[in-house]
């Protein structure tokens, strides 16, 4: 019986073609990007902070008399809806082991994160300004709920910080495509 003997044959390196770049390597999955555990945790954190800020504001009986507080409620509702929807998408992508690197989807996420981050930051700043006005300048914290206003505003800033991280990481993903 003729048995073949294994042999190692050296393979030459293909010659480089002038003007042709080597194939691009895909960027590693950095935690916090869409479709990762970190991305899911960021979205859930955004949702929780915005939901608690919304709940605190709505629990104050006269919040609707101040426009900045109404704006904060509207911004946190939008933030809750956006973050919950993307948390569901991230969770689904993790369950079925799919990558969320479609250019159109990543572009949509960048724009959505940018818009919600801007709105949440503006609402938190406006609410912080009114809270400082009521507490420090007018000295009417006894009649108003300054501690609740401050807590809701601080939570809105935390939600903004987390959505800003999502925006930066998603923008980086889009820019390195």
From Swiss-Prot:
Query: Ligase: is it a keyword of this entry?
Result: no
The way this protein sits in the membrane is described as: Multi-pass membrane protein
Q: Which InterPro entries match?
A: CASP_dom, CASPL-5
Extracellular side of the membrane: what ranges? Answer: 58-68, 125-153
According to the record, the segments passing through the membrane are: 37-57, 69-89, 104-124, 154-174
Glyco sites are at: 62
Q: Name one GO cellular component term.
A: plasma membrane
Record's keyword terms, sorted: Cell membrane, Glycoprotein, Membrane, Transmembrane, Transmembrane helix
Complexes and interactors = Homodimer and heterodimers.
Q: Which family does it belong to?
A: Belongs to the Casparian strip membrane proteins (CASP) family.
Identify the PANTHER family for this entry. CASP-LIKE PROTEIN 5A1, CASP-LIKE PROTEIN 5B3
> Would you tell me the protein name for this molecule?
CASP-like protein 5A2
The organism is Ginkgo biloba
């Amino acid at each position: 019986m003729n048995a073949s003997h294994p042999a190692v044959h050296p393979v030459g390196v293909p010659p480089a073609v002038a003007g042709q770049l080597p194939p691009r390597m895909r960027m590693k999955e950095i935690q916090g990007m869409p479709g990762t555990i970190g991305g899911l945790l960021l979205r859930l954190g955004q949702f929780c902070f915005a939901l608690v800020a919304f709940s605190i504001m709505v629990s104050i009986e006269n919040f609707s008399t101040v426009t900045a507080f109404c704006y904060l409620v509207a911004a946190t509702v939008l933030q809750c809806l956006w973050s919950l929807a993307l948390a569901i998408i991230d969770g689904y992508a993790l369950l079925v082991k799919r990558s969320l690197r479609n250019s159109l989807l990543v572009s949509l996420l960048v724009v959505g994160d940018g818009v919600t981050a801007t709105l949440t930051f503006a609402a938190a700043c406006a609410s912080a300004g009114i809270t400082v006005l009521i507490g420090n300048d007018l000295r009417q914290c006894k009649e108003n709920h300054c501690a609740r206003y401050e807590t809701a505003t601080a939570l809105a800033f935390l939600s903004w910080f987390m959505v800003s991280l999502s925006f930066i990481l998603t923008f980086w993903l889009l820019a390195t495509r």
